């Protein structure tokens, strides 16, 4: 199994069975799959660096293929909660689309109700893109050329969400939760690694997410940061 993608604690999954596999099941040998054919090396570098901030995650060194993009992760800041920022994101995707190839674009939300954030005419406006919405949990095991992650910000239904610290849920969670937002970090890792080519992360500077603040640091040179032109027009 892959401990980096263990995201079902809410259903009773216990990641200690991965960390302490040999203690539970007896003598074993570990074989790492050290090549990824799903996404490019910059996406791999960002996501693996991010997930291994938790010292309890198993350490792995994985290699992949190079990318044609100078920056493969782009953070789009939407300060005013205006849905029009998604048009800007999709204009960027259209501009990057090589040889008018029909790309698969998946919009990911930490929660299902975030689908209402998507403008009704998005699919009809961008007919050369195959657009769909999924929750991050539902997307596990799947992939798309481009991933757009909605509302990576703080708050109860943010990302990481404050609900992760629910005291009732903490009673059944593993001790590894001593590392802050451990489960949410893995969920975010799953979101990042659904992308084959490029990732757009949508956030709000008024409700900063610790994940965004981390990605904006010098540790992640593969990440670019931009303020939505919708916001610029309103300033």
Task: Walk through the language-model features, giving the residues of each.
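Short, aromatic/basic amphipathic alpha-helical patches
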Residues: 21, 117-126, 210-219
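Conserved RecA-like helicase ATPase core segment
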Residues: 1-71, 161, 212
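Conserved helicase C-terminal RecA-like lobe
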Residues: 101-102, 127-130, 134, 139-205, ...
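Conserved helicase/translocase motor-coupling segment
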Residues: 80-142, 151
């Amino acid at each position: 199994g892959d401990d980096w993608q263990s995201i079902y604690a809410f259903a009773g999954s216990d990641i200690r069975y991965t960390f302490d596999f040999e203690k539970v099941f007896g003598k074993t040998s570990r074989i790492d799959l050290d090549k990824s054919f799903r996404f490019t090396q910059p996406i791999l570098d960002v996501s693996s660096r991010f997930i291994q901030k938790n010292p309890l995650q198993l350490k792995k060194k994985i290699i992949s293929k190079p990318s044609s993009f100078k920056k493969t992760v782009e953070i789009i800041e939407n300060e005013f909660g205006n849905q029009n920022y998604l048009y800007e994101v999709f204009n960027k995707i259209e501009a990057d689309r090589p040889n008018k190839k029909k790309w698969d674009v998946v919009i990911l939300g930490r929660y299902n109700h975030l689908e209402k954030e998507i403008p009704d005419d998005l699919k009809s406006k961008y007919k050369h893109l195959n657009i769909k919405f999924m929750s991050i949990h539902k997307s596990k095991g799947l992939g798309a050329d481009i991933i757009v992650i909605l509302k990576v910000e703080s708050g109860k239904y943010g990302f990481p969400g404050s609900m992760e610290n629910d005291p009732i849920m903490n009673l059944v969670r593993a001790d590894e939760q001593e590392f802050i937002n451990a489960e949410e970090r893995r969920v975010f890792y799953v979101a990042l690694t659904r992308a084959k080519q490029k990732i757009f992360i949508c956030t709000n500077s008024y409700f900063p997410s610790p994940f965004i603040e981390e990605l904006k640091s010098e540790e992640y040179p593969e990440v670019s940061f931009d303020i939505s032109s919708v916001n610029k027009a309103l300033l």
